[in-house]
């Protein structure tokens, strides 16, 4: 079940490991063999063969996600109120909307082509920005530029009050759509 769940979520590289060959070692589980006392050990080979086969079949493809979520690593340090991006990610996942997290340096270097956010070889139809009272100026400048270039930008709950540098965010952000989390 866990392997299938991870595969469905896009994980296709697995490194199974046991932390300590000493058994029993309560501080370092799991023990795959456990001196023959692990009743599931004979099935472990089958699980690993299945995992290898599925991971191989699902690798090398082109990932398509239509939504980019701004990864606001600076939110906690900005001193204001903020929403964890996990809240937005959970809501998107519950509604089966695939997404990628985009940090500020990648967002600042991105461009908009034909109404889509283009990052490396990926393109996204919308950028979702979790609520944050303050956003770095570099981010508000990038979002303003992307809005002017025609990207659909959605701020969750409300626009930021100011930049992290305590500067006004500018009028361009007002063109973005404000949406509730749920």
Task: Give, region by region, the residue ranges found by the protein language model.
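Carbohydrate-binding surfaces of carbohydrate-active enzymes
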Residues: 1-182
């Amino acid at each position: 079940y866990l392997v299938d769940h991870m595969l469905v979520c896009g994980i296709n590289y697995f490194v199974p490991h046991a932390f300590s060959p000493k058994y029993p070692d309560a501080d370092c589980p799991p023990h795959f063999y456990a001196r023959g006392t692990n009743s599931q050990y004979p099935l472990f080979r089958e699980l690993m063969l299945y995992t290898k086969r599925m991971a191989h079949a699902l690798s090398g493809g082109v990932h398509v996600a239509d939504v980019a979520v701004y990864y606001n690593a600076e939110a906690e340090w900005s001193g204001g109120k903020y929403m964890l991006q996990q809240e937005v990610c959970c809501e998107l996942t519950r509604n089966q909307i695939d997404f990628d997290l985009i940090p500020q340096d990648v967002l600042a270097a991105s461009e908009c082509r034909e109404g889509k956010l283009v990052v490396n070889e990926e393109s996204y139809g919308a950028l979702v920005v979790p609520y944050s009272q303050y956003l770095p100026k570099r981010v508000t400048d990038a979002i303003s530029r992307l809005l002017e270039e025609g990207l659909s930008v959605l701020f969750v709950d409300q626009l930021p009050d100011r930049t992290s540098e305590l500067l006004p965010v500018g009028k361009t952000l007002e063109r973005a759509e404000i949406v509730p989390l749920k």
